Amino acid sequence: MNKILLVDDDRELTSLLKELLEMEGFNVIVAHDGEQALDLLDDSIDLLLLDVMMPKKNGIDTLKALRQTHQTPVIMLTARGSELDRVLGLELGADDYLPKPFNDRELVARIRAILRRSHWSEQQQNNDNGSPTLEVDALVLNPGRQEASFDGQTLELTGTEFTLLYLLAQHLGQVVSREHLSQEVLGKRLTPFDRAIDMHISNLRRKLPDRKDGHPWFKTLRGRGYLMVSAS
């Protein structure tokens, strides 16, 4: 049973969400502020639902502290129209965001999509015949360990960032649409103002060292998508 840490200061909302998620088969632990969430966080937590506006330590500061020690998947719960919070959350390593008020089915679908990705990584680790290790320039992507390294040095990537990078490497030199990336990486259909994939690409550009061959890692083709640049 997957364990979810639900972090929100709205006690009525957390009570309703806890009941909903437990009916969907999840084990739910509740925290009402960021400090309490960090105290409860351990390796048994499979995913965090993290509200932005909270007392003591808000969601952004909590995410920043969390990412120093854990790569646990995080879905940020933001106020509708709060574009700055969404962008900042994604920059700091959130996997996805969901604006309030949200549809219960959409929340459950987002959770299941991210957990499927995490379970895929675990299966790769336990399967000698899983997806192959990929190499681009001095970058090595090992899906079994969900680990990226450059020139032998491990890169600190979130699970979502690794999945996105691996998918683009699988289609090296080919354009992959934002719609396909959103569906495969985040498990959701792309909406007109959804910038999650764009922000994850931006994070990868910031985290990846310069290539030895002098090429950029990615090209943006407006209206079409992204491609990972091949050496040729």
UniProtKB/Swiss-Prot annotation:
Listed Pfam families: Response_reg, Trans_reg_C
Keyword hit for Nucleus: no
Gene Ontology CC annotations of this record: cytosol; protein-DNA complex
The entry's keywords: Activator, Cell adhesion, Cytoplasm, DNA-binding, Phosphoprotein, Stress response, Transcription, Transcription regulation, Two-component regulatory system
Molecular function (Gene Ontology), one example: phosphorelay response regulator activity
Inducers of expression: Induced about 3-fold when stationary phase cells bind to hydrophobic surfaces; requires direct contact with hydrophobic surfaces for up-regulation of Cpx activity.
Main subcellular localisation: cytoplasm
SMART domains: REC (SM00448), Trans_reg_C (SM00862)
Disulfide bonds: none
Domain called Response regulatory: residue spans: 3-115
DNA-binding region (UniProt annotation): 131-230
Modified residues (4-aspartylphosphate): D51
Post-translational modification: Phosphorylated by CpxA.
Subunit relationships: Interacts with cognate sensor kinase CpxA.
Function: Response regulator member of the two-component regulatory system CpxA/CpxR which responds to envelope stress response by activating expression of downstream genes including cpxP, degP, dsbA and ppiA. Required for efficient binding of stationary phase cells to hydrophobic surfaces, part of the process of biofilm formation. Induced upon cell surface binding, subsequently induces genes it controls (cpxP, dsbA and spy, degP is only partially induced). Binds and activates transcription from the degP promoter; binding is enhanced by phosphorylation.
The protein's name in its UniProt record: Transcriptional regulatory protein CpxR
